[in-house]
């Protein structure tokens, strides 16, 4: 075992050769490097698989032995200061390494097909390899300086991938926005690290926790300054994990390729903030005010993310706000001291959200040949609908991910979210009400995404102009009787998974639809069939095998990963696998907790949380399921139309919520008017002062000297006698001035 830990330092460096070789190859041998591009993909997956196997082996040892291993090397600067760097292996490191590698491998496999037609294919894989290296280095770091170094590398890789298509102004602006927002958090983190070193004199985690606790117990440090340093440490995770108010970069980060959106939201960028708070929790837990701030920021983010997701039209931005809300749950759990629940939800959410993002990428790929390659169209849920029969495997995978995120048993997120809701009830009734209400909102907006995407008809072909020039939007007809389509009778799961890419002429197949009378007069996007007056529509086709395979693996994770936190004791809920994994941390955070909970209490709490989720799903079905239009003609619903006053108030409330959500809570607008515009005005004034005043003085002296020289040259006429005359004149004037001042004194 000791032999295994001695080589743990190599974990971050195993995936590193690929980005280095790709960078050198593209600079020195671009043609040969591009011709071997599939080899680089295979090598990336192979090296990351080695790290995954190594991490699993370390995790098994952690479960049975529950030990912590640290190895450091000292780099002496002088007699007073020496910097130590090394690696730190504990349960948190092991489980984060497994999470990063498993999701990373699946995203790499997915990206091979998704990015196959992109000119930046190799650049993308170089960034991805460096991204995985940076994140693995972060989770294995033994001190705060190493953490900060890899923290910045993780941020740099995320900026490169968010702005991967940098020729698009929107992507470039999103990259800049992510960079500037995270600069605020990273600067706070740096100040917190320096302040903590000034107090304790150490960067090492174990020494830091011990010294910090002794200072608190013996009252040998200013508590206010200590709280300030701890808060500055927390500012970094606020920005990195998209917590309020530094969350504004996350929705715009969806301008990057979809595979990197899956990796950022599941296992790298946003998970880094949760990891750091979990790593520093023994430090935060001795300061109650900081714990309350962490939980408060978490609960605000939970509610804000859920409300902002309610009216999003972009499928990826809807999932992004969902990530923001779920990260708020994790931060809330950490603020309450529920270390196990937070990390459990981090694990379950990672696989569920990776599945949803990869599913959305499959949907976007299917829509691009119909609506074009503009993200405003291919990612717009309003133009989707009716994809169930066209992409059945993607639909099933997306549905499982949606149900998991809604908290439906026995899927993964049910077990972890239920624990957080129960802990919030013990922590604060107000926080519990908000957390439970948001669980219902989560079910609502997730099924809204699902229903708009897969149910009804393909809305691209049912787009109808409202008929009013002043209309601010196009009205959509979601209904229309569908008649028989030409389908491939041999279509099935096994042939789909075994076919080659060469067996498919394109990603899409041609299908002819007959339109019923109730939509006959609407305006359609049509393709003329070789001059014939026949309307032929192109419909999405299921994605290729290399896109579907990672999704199917993530489906298995979503179905079964919750088992690591499910208790199996017949008498009560005893410590499960995950609890054994985090035994040292549980003893630290819950010293007086009982080792089991009654099954009756568990079932009662689970029934309550599932009921909330089903209520949210029911509301979503009522509002977005296609058969809702027929219900409007029922007498029961028509009777509500008579209550005009109440209906008007209800519509005002709905419009307010819609505008709030669609405009991102007006937070971006507030930052733009109050902060960005002020900084721009200050920058313009500074530029004016620098160019007109500072440069004006300098340039004025130079220009004056130039003209004096020119005048002197003109008067002198290049004769020595003239120069002597001018020189004597200056001396005489100087003596007269001196003589005048001399007699003034007397």
Curated annotation (Swiss-Prot):
Topological category with respect to the lipid bilayer: Multi-pass membrane protein
Swiss-Prot/TrEMBL GO biological process terms: ATP synthesis coupled electron transport
InterPro entries (alphabetical): NADH_UbQ_OxRdtase_chlpt_su5_C, NADHpl_OxRdtase_5_subgr, ND/Mrp_TM, NU5C-like, Proton_antipo_N
EC number: 7.1.1.-
Entries under Gene3D superfamilies matching the protein: 1.20.5.2700
One Pfam family cited in the UniProt record for this chain: Proton_antipo_N
Bilayer-spanning residue ranges: 9-29, 40-60, 89-109, 125-145, 147-167, 185-205, 221-241, 258-278, 280-300, 327-347, 354-374, 396-416, 425-445, 547-567, 608-628, 723-743
GO cellular component term of the entry, any: chloroplast
Function: NDH shuttles electrons from NAD(P)H:plastoquinone, via FMN and iron-sulfur (Fe-S) centers, to quinones in the photosynthetic chain and possibly in a chloroplast respiratory chain. The immediate electron acceptor for the enzyme in this species is believed to be plastoquinone. Couples the redox reaction to proton translocation, and thus conserves the redox energy in a proton gradient.
Family (UniProt): Belongs to the complex I subunit 5 family.
Name of the protein: NAD(P)H-quinone oxidoreductase subunit 5, chloroplastic
Organism of origin: Arabidopsis thaliana (Mouse-ear cress)
């Amino acid at each position: 075992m000791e032999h295994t830990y001695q080589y743990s330092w190599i974990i971050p460096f195993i995936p590193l050769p690929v980005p280095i070789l790709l960078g050198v190859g593209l600079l020195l041998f671009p043609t040969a490097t591009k011709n071997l591009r599939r080899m680089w993909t295979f090598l990336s997956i192979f090296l990351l698989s080695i790290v995954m196997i190594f991490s699993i082996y370390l995790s098994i040892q952690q479960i049975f032995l529950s030990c912590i291993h640290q190895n450091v090397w000292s780099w002496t600067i002088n007699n007073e200061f020496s910097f130590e760097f090394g690696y730190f292996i504990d349960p948190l490191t092991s489980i984060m390494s497994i999470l990063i590698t498993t999701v990373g491998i699946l995203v790499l496999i997915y990206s091979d097909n998704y990015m196959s037609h992109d000119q930046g294919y190799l650049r993308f894989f170089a960034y991805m390899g460096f991204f995985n290296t940076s994140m693995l280095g972060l989770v294995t770091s033994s001190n705060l300086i190493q953490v900060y170094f890899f923290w910045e590398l993780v941020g740099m890789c995320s900026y490169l991938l968010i702005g991967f298509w940098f020729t698009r102004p929107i992507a470039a602006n999103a990259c800049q926005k992510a960079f500037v927002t995270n600069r605020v958090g990273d600067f706070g983190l740096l100040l917190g690290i320096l302040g903590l070193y000034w107090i304790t004199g150490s960067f090492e985690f174990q020494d830091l926790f011990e010294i910090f606790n002794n200072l608190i117990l013996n009252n040998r440090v200013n508590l206010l300054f200590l709280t300030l340093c701890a808060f500055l440490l927390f500012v970094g995770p606020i920005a990195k994990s998209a917590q309020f108010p530094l969350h504004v970069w996350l929705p715009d980060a969806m301008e990057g390729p979809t595979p990197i959106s899956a990796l950022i939201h599941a296992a790298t960028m946003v998970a880094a903030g949760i990891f750091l708070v979990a790593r520093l929790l023994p430090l935060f837990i001795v300061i109650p005010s900081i714990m309350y701030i962490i939980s408060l920021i978490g609960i605000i983010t939970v509610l804000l993310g859920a409300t902002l997701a309610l009216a999003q039209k972009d499928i990826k931005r809807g999932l992004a706000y969902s990530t923001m809300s779920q990260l708020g749950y994790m931060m809330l759990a950490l603020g309450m001291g529920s270390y196990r629940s937070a990390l459990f939800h981090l694990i379950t959410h990672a696989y569920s959200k990776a599945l949803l993002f990869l599913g959305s990428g499959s949907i976007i790929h299917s829509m691009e040949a119909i609506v074009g390659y503009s993200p405003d169209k291919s990612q717009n849920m309003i133009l989707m609908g009716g994809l169930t029969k066209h992409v059945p495997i993607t639909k099933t995978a997306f549905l499982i991910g949606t149900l998991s995120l809604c908290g439906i048993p026995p899927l993964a997120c049910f077990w972890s979210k239920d624990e957080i809701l129960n802990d919030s009830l013990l922590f604060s009734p107000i926080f519990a009400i908000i957390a439970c209400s948001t669980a219902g909102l989560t079910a609502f907006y997730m099924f809204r995404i699902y229903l708009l995407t897969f149910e009804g008809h393909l809305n691209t072909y049912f787009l109808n102009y409202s008929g009013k020039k002043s209309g601010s939007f196009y009205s959509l007809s979601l209904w229309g009787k569908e008649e028989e389509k030409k389908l491939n009778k041999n279509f099935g799961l096994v042939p789909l998974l075994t076919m080659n890419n060469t067996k498919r002429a394109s990603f899409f197949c041609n299908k002819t639809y007959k339109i019923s009378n109730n939509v006959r007069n609407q305006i359609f996007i049509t393709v003329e069939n070789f001059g014939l007056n026949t309307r032929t529509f192109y419909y999405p086709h299921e994605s290729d095998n290399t896109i579907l395979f990672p999704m199917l693996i993530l489906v298995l994770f979503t179905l079964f990963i919750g088992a690591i936190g499910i208790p199996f004791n017949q008498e009560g809920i005893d410590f499960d696998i995950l609890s054994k994994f985090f035994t040292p941390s549980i003893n630290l955070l819950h010293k007086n907790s009982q080792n089991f909970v009654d099954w009756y209490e568990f079932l009662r709490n689970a029934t309550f949380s599932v009921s909330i989720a089903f209520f949210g799903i029911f509301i979503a079905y009522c509002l977005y399921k296609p058969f809702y239009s027929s219900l409007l003609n029922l007498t029961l619903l028509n009777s509500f139309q008579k209550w005009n006053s109440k209906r008007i108030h209800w519509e005002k409330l709905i419009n307010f919520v819609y505008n709030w959500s669609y405009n991102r809570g007006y937070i971006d607008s507030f930052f733009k008017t109050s902060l960005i515009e002020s900084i721009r005005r200050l920058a313009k004034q500074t530029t004016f002062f620098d160019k007109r005043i500072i440069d004006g003085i300098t340039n004025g002296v130079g220009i004056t000297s130039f003209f004096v020289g020119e005048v002197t040259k003109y008067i002198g006429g290049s004769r020595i006698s003239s120069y002597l005359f001018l020189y004597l004149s200056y001396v005489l004037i100087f003596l007269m001035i001196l003589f005048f001042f001399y007699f003034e004194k007397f």
